[in-house]
């Protein structure tokens, strides 16, 4: 008997980097293949084109997913965040006009989780943790998360680089990152910067140019269409294993006031982080599923 699809709630900052588009595409491809079920997506920046870009990718797969966005219109909403989201929204169909009211991420999360069985949801975060911190701090959503979510997997941190530095997703909202790592009582896995910074993917999108992810990569990366696979690796590691990557032993993760993340092995801990063992193998594995996703988007 096949395993039940993993119930996934995704939070993304789609806009400041293009790998979010590929990560969402491979997640939707995994849903199509039966290993995942996407129950909702929230956007954690203030860009008015974020939901349009997300919805355009979902529609490229022929699906509609409950969506919501960060209500703080000043958070990461400058020109960099619009670099590809605006062109994507102007090229592909979606249901979120930029000047129309957009659903609040908090309500989207509450609605999605309230329909799920206890301990059944994996929450994936591929951006700053402002939305998740808000969810956990809310008197309704916080207890609901602790009840319904089994595990959080986030692209965050830096553990093995030399020298260690404050990773971007953490740096953009250090208090939020500390809130999530401290308030969340369940298992939390981090896919840090060094785990996928040398794993380059996206070239396969040149073979299937007529889809939102391909346009995003072409605008962001130029004709080489190669980018580190931080968000792709986070999604795939949340769903299972990736060739060339592995999880650390159990332990604890602390984030200091400057946003530096530190891991301490502890058999009683419920935190892990991803390690890269073979960059070429990881790139092949991620590129293979991205190619299938691109083919699906192009044929819809």
Label each residue range with its predicted role:
Residues 1-300:
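N-terminal acidic, glycine/proline-rich low-complexity segments
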């Amino acid at each position: 008997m096949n395993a039940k699809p993993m119930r996934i709630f995704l939070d993304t900052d789609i806009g400041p980097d293009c790998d979010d588009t590929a990560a969402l595409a491979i997640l939707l491809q995994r849903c199509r293949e039966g290993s995942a079920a996407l129950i909702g997506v929230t956007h954690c920046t203030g860009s008015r084109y974020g939901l349009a870009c997300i919805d355009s990718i979902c529609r490229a797969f022929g699906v509609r997913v409950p969506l919501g966005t960060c209500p703080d219109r000043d958070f990461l909403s400058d020109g960099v965040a619009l670099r590809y989201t605006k062109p994507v929204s102007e090229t592909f169909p979606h249901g979120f006009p930029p000047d129309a009211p957009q659903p609040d991420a908090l309500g989207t999360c509450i609605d999605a989780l309230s329909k799920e069985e206890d301990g059944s949801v994996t929450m994936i975060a591929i951006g700053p943790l402002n939305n998740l911190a808000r969810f956990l701090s809310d008197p309704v959503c916080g207890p609901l998360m602790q009840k319904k979510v089994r595990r959080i997997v986030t692209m965050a941190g830096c553990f093995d680089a030399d020298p260690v530095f404050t990773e971007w997703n953490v740096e953009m909202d250090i208090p939020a990152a500390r809130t999530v790592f401290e308030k969340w009582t369940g298992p939390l896995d981090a896919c840090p910067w060094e785990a996928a910074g040398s794993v380059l993917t996206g070239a396969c999108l040149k073979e299937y140019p007529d889809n939102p992810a391909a346009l995003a990569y072409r605008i962001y990366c130029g004709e080489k269409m190669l980018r580190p696979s931080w968000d792709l690796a986070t999604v795939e590691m949340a769903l299972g294993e990736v060739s060339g990557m592995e999880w650390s032993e159990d332990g604890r993760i602390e984030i200091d006031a400057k946003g530096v993340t530190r891991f301490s092995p502890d058999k009683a801990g419920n935190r892990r982080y991803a390690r890269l063992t073979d960059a070429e193998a990881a790139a092949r594995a991620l590129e293979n599923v991205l190619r299938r996703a691109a083919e699906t988007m192009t044929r819809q």
